[in-house]
Amino acid sequence: MHFIYRFSQGLRLRQVDMLQEGITGSSSTLTKLAYRLRGVCKSAIKRMRRRGDLKIGKRHEIVFIDESKFGHKRKYNRGRQSNRASWVFGMLGVKEEFRRPILKVVNQRSAQHLMPILQKHVRQGSTVVSDGWRAYNGLRDAGYNHLTVNHKEVFVDPQTGAHTQNIERLWGVCKATVWRCRRNRTESRLKDHLKVIEWTYWRGDVHKNGPLGMILHDIRRKYPV
């Protein structure tokens, strides 16, 4: 239960710490537990997507979009320095104090790759804020109210007040979370971590009993007795 609590709260999952604290006597047990809990989060997010609940925008919810590169770490920091990295496309719905991210690993940052993802998850007619990346030039024609910020000149547009600080903060949270979760060695593992982050914002933070209450609820859904 202590491990489940730490996982649901996004706390650091270093095996050496938990072994020293007596949470478990085996590192392999911890690895299996983490794998199972990531699976629980992924299943919960997939259920939401099948129901059509994983959408953002409209009704006073502004959507911030951006891309960020996540480098893959070498195991034990050995071997050649790896240049492998994955681009992640982030869409963040912001309404009052609520933050709801959708995070997708993408092969390219072109309009051809990004626009279909955005149109699938962001409701048409929404206000979308981005930087000046050319892949977003067609947003207005696609039915969105598009605001841009030219970071080469300003961080906040003086006329519209548009900025990208919300999603920049999200990237900081995402990368810190991936770092705590024993690094990000493959694209597949990165996708798992991103699903856990989505779960935290969409489910863990809104349950009346907090993230622990929601992870226990989702465990029962995935592994009914």
Describe the predicted segments one by one:
Residues 1-225:
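Residue-level recognition of single "structural anchor" positions
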